[in-house]
From Swiss-Prot:
DNA-binding region(s) in UniProt: 278-458
Name of the protein in question: Eomesodermin homolog
Subcellular location(s) per record: Nucleus
Effect of disrupting the coding gene: Embryonic lethal due to peri-implantation defects. Mutant embryos arrest soon after implantation and fail to form organized embryonic or extraembryonic structures. Conditional mutants, with expression abrogated in the inner cell mass of embryos from early implantation stages onward, display gastrulation defects.
CDD domains: T-box_TBR2
Length: 707
């Protein structure tokens, strides 16, 4: 074993160990090889170091090898020690000769040459006291001194949650506490992390790190961190992290943590900004807040968690909004620029006291403290007593500040004790007061995160976050999909659900039929005729499905008609076997068939609850409006109700209804009624409809003439 290793191992237990030079230790180790030559094994002290107050007494040394027999008293003094060698340590050779010669009954040592341990008859000093002064100069590495921390229980306590980043308030100072990095950079954490990291409830009151830090740097929260002392590092070990709280410090300078048991002004609040991530999103684009005459609430609003208060003391908690800089701002070129000086003569209320003030510290620490009802206004004559609206001036930058003031039980503040007032500032809560949003990024953030920002949503589709393919129906502004009566993806649900389930789906699952009617003179545009060239891919209704209304929810053409008036046409479902029947989309028959059968699933009144109905009002469909008026005038005839629904159609297939009307008059199986004379039917056909007939008229004749 080398002498340097012996020094590192054994001197830790020395009560008065000093700094030893390894160079001199190596020199002394070379002369200690002789059996009785102890003089060469002595070690010199560092220059300027005081001599050891006591020499090494082997009788008081620790027992390293319990297997050795006790030594005789007075036999542990080395031969070289009497030659005037300074009180130091023995080399392995010296110790081996001594123990080997004086202990007559000693057992042979281990094969590696180590000898038995010395006697231990007296109690050694505590390990913590010895370790507090155990420092060495490793000149083989560098000229610095390395401090060896004690392995006591204090080191484990410092790893507790209470030793997180310090987070004092910033009051009067431009920045909070700073942590000096290795490269000299300084990082302010004053508006980011709380002073204790965790509430005092998880920290026992009697914590060692809250006591005085003798000889260490001051707490990082009060002076910016003593760069050399252990108190400058939140994860440091050894001496206590935080110095004692000084009640005479400036108000708002949150220093070290105050223990829960310290009375009086030693309580310091620790404040967290609860919705800080949301504030940061707005802060990246320079937050803007709307101000109005009636007052407008802030979004994001101020929300805090408070810890470290005296549970039995009473506090007032209020927010003050002050100017953040002396500049007047304007939005130009996509960014905010200064344009002159701010108006400092603005009169009006600048404070908002929380409605629950005054209250005890335990009340404030129990839950989140929200200022969601705080309103901003530009009305200088706002009543301060009722609404507590904060009066601001447009295009000025403001900084909210949180004040916590200790008061009496009656809510009276002691103005002679400024230390009872604590102020906290969060730089990310700065905002510019505006009468209308200037930055579109801020507007979008308000829409995305504020559930009450309905004034910015001009239509319902802006609330969707899913892609267009994920919707059941398309947007009314899409083209050409908006010109389809039955979009392909709209009724694809019938492939997966049985018919009873589809019929019972709520109407809110589908858009109203008015959204899909083309805004043209005719019902079908040429573009749609091309789209439905292959109709079997879109027609998903089987021939046995009678309630066609549930599939063709065209509310604009069936709102005024009942199934009873069209009963002759709703007895059977339309046969889909013929090629002409499959070409139903350009055929004007189907708009009228939208009213056949039961119409309870889709009502026009349901469209009133949908945000887009204002766009699709009746003026958009003038033909439909005229048709409704004509129906009201001639409601006495059951045959009159059918033609108005197709009166606006300019399709060449309108002769289908012409033939159907004649069949009503000529068929012997269906006698004419008194309220539908044949002449009336002929007049309607002559005045309003074309005489042309479609190619597949035979299919309709065959259908209606069948018994």
């Amino acid at each position: 074993m080398q002498l340097g290793e012996q020094l590192l191992v054994s001197s830790v237990n020395l009560p008065g160990a000093h700094f030893y030079s390894l160079e001199s230790a190596r020199g002394g180790g070379g002369g200690g090889g002789g059996g009785g030559g102890g003089g060469g094994g002595s070690v010199s002290l560092l220059p300027g170091a005081a001599p050891s107050p006591q020499r090494l007494d082997l009788d008081k040394a620790s027992k390293k090898f319990p297997g050795s027999l006790p030594c005789q008293a007075g036999s542990a003094e080395p031969a070289g020690a009497g030659a005037g060698a300074p009180a130091a340590m023995l080399s392995d050779a010296d110790a081996g000769d001594t123990f080997g010669s004086t202990s007559a009954v000693a057992k042979p040592g281990p094969p590696d040459g180590r000898k038995g341990s010395p006697c231990a008859e007296e109690e050694l000093p505590s390990a913590a006291t010895a370790a507090a002064t155990a420092r060495y100069s490793m000149d083989s590495l560098s000229s610095e001194r390395y401090y060896l921390p004690s392995p006591g229980p204090q080191g484990s306590e410092l790893a507790a949650p209470c030793s997180l980043f310090q987070y004092p308030a910033a009051a009067g100072a431009a920045h909070g506490p700073v942590y000096p990095a290795s490269n000299g950079a300084r990082y302010p954490y004053g508006s980011m992390l709380p002073p204790g990291g965790f509430p005092a409830a998880v920290c026992p009151p009697a914590r060692a790190q809250f006591g005085p830090a003798a000889g260490s740097g001051s707490g990082a929260g009060s002076s910016g961190g003593g760069a050399g002392g252990p108190g400058a590092y939140p994860y440091g070990q050894g001496s206590p992290l935080y110095g004692p709280y000084a009640g005479t410090s400036a108000a708002g300078s949150c220093g070290g943590l105050g223990g829960l048991g310290v009375p009086g002004s030693g309580f310091r609040a620790h404040v967290y900004l609860c919705n800080r991530p949301l504030w940061l999103k707005f802060h990246r684009h320079q937050t803007e807040m709307i101000i109005t005459k009636q007052g407008r609430r802030m979004f994001p609003f101020l929300s805090f968690n408070i810890n470290g208060l005296n549970p039995t003391a009473h506090y007032n908690v209020f927010v003050e909004v002050v100017l953040a800089d002396p500049n007047h701002w304007r939005f130009q070129g996509g960014k905010w620029v200064t344009c002159g000086k701010a108006d400092n003569n603005m009169q009006g209320n600048k404070m908002y006291v929380h409605p629950e003030s005054p209250n005890t510290g335990s009340h404030w620490m129990r839950q989140e403290i929200s200022f969601g009802k705080l309103k901003l206004t530009n009305n200088k004559g706002a009543n301060n007593n009722n609404t507590q609206m904060i009066v601001l001036q447009s295009l000025h930058k403001y900084q909210p500040r949180l004040h916590i003031v200790e008061v009496t039980e009656d809510g009276v503040e002691d103005l002679n004790e400024p230390s009872k007032t604590q102020t906290f500032t969060f730089s990310e809560t700065q905002f510019i007061a505006v009468t209308a949003y200037q930055n579109t990024d801020i507007t979008q953030l308000k829409i995305d995160h504020n559930p009450f920002a309905k004034g910015f949503r001009d239509n319902y589709d802006s609330m969707y976050t899913a892609s267009e393919n994920d919707r059941l129906t398309p947007s009314p502004t899409d083209s050409p999909r908006s010109h389809q009566i039955v979009p392909g993806g709209r009724y694809g649900v019938q492939n997966f659900f049985p018919e009873p389930f589809v019929n019972t789906l709520p109407q809110a699952r589908y858009y109203n039929g008015e959204r899909t009617v083309p805004q043209t003179n005719g019902l079908l545009s040429p573009q749609q005729s091309e789209e439905v060239a292959n109709p079997p891919q879109r027609w998903l209704v089987t021939p046995v499905q009678q309630p066609v209304t549930n599939k063709l929810d065209i509310g604009s053409y069936e709102s005024e008609y009942t199934s009873s008036t069209l009963l002759p046409y709703g007895i059977k479902s339309l046969p889909l076997q013929t090629s002409h029947a499959l070409g139903y989309y350009p055929d004007p028959t189907f708009p009228a068939m939208a009213g056949w059968g039961g119409r309870g699933a889709y009502q026009r009144k349901m469209a009133a609850g949908l945000p887009w109905t204002s766009r699709m009002s009746p003026p958009v469909f003038p033909e439909d409006q005229l048709a409704k008026e004509k129906v009201k005038e001639e409601i006495s005839s059951s045959w009159i109700e059918t033609p108005p629904s197709i009166k606006s159609l300019d399709s060449s297939d309108s002769g289908v209804y012409n033939s159907a009307c004649k069949r009503k008059r000529l068929s012997p199986s269906t006698p004419s009624n008194g309220n539908s004379p044949p002449i009336k039917c002929e007049d309607i056909n002559t005045e309003e409809y074309s005489k042309d007939t479609s190619k597949g008229m035979g299919a309709y004749y065959a259908f209606y003439t069948s018994p």
